[in-house]
Amino acid sequence: MPMHKLETAFHPRSIAVVGASTNTMSASYSFVQHLLTYGYRGKIYPINISKSKLLGLKTYPSLKDIPDSVDYVICCIPAPKVPDLLQECHQKGVKVVHLFTGRLTETGLVEAAELEKEILEQARKFGIRLIGPNCMGIYSPFEGISFGYDFPTEPGPLGMFFQSGGASTEFVHYASLRGIRFSKVISYGNALDLDETDFLQYLSQDAETKVIASYMEGIKDGRKFLCALRQTTAVKPVIILKAGRGVAGTRAVASHTASLAGSFRIWETAIRQTGAILVHTLEEMIDAAVSFCWLPPVLGTRVGVVGGGGGKSVRSADEWEEAGFHVVPLPPEIRQEITKKVPQMWWDWIENPVDVSIMPESAWVSGLNGEILRMMSESPSFDLVIANITVDGPFGKNEMIAFINGEVQDILEINRRRTKPLAVVLDTGTLGIGDFDHWRWRFLAEQKTTLTAAKIPVYPTIAQAAKAIHHVLTYYRKN
């Protein structure tokens, strides 16, 4: 595939939205609005046969009426009209068409499948590449192109190709709450022309993309895709969520994007052999993306854990070991430094994970948590350091705020000088209606925001942190 075709899609000098409506509830209206809201710098041409203006922009009855060339078309017209549109696209020199248009093969109707075949033949005849049909298209913060409301306007390192528009929107919204930012996102639907392999190959060579994530319901050419995936994982991490794993899921896939799901066990084995990371939920994918985007390579299993309280320390030991890490004993030099700060009666309790909550108040207020974290981060005995932020200590509001503020400032300082991977576990709660104004959850959310702004990976639970970071370990051991 000529790479410049997708370069045109992601860096178009002009975009036409065909079927642009004045109905504010329509997707076609939103596509035009997003180009304006997100600051697209190229020319925007709404195509509407009955209106002269849309959102302050001059409209045109057809592509043929546009005086200049058009690079990229977003098609929002009924499927039977698409072949004629492609003829107009050819005349205007359009290189890529995003078919938001649906109701094709995914309907299961014979006539819809025949129309889809005609559309593909027409596109190939004219040398036009298609994204879709039945998809949301492209989100490119660098260019100011978006298919969703309230997506981040600033770019980042994560590139995505998702077969589902709904899943891609959900992922962008929730991952952005964790601080993730995006290079390019493609919702590609039925993959009539450009498919998962094309998008993977493009993102693998894209300098703006450092990590790749994909949600797929089926693959058009398994051998070709796996070959491209193996080549890509040699240079960039790829995280894959395969939907349609069971009987009901397979049925849903067929009606959603007209994909053949295939055997998940075969999928799983093949994907893992390429060096890609296979996840099972969007939440696990977000955790993995946070880890790959912000952690340096994790090259060993020796983990040091500080803080969290007694029960959390015990759970930490279990859950890190169950995930495949080794909660190694504290080295003598760190134990010796801690014994200088606490009375002898506490010496027998100084172990990894280090639970400062059982130590005297003087250890808390002196910042011993941060000092231990710093020593672990500098020690050759650990490959990875985890800060469990204590959210339920035996103290009141003012004391808790002061203590956690101190912890977070210590973490920020250590991160600035870090010599090994550092991550944080901070539970900001699952909020009910009455909790949003509670000082505790508001304060913890502020601390999480501070940490993510510094590109420190933050996880809501120990188990999520351990599983996600183990994905990083697995990837770098293979590559």
Predicted regions and their residues:
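Catalytic-core regions of core metabolic enzymes
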Residues: 1-479
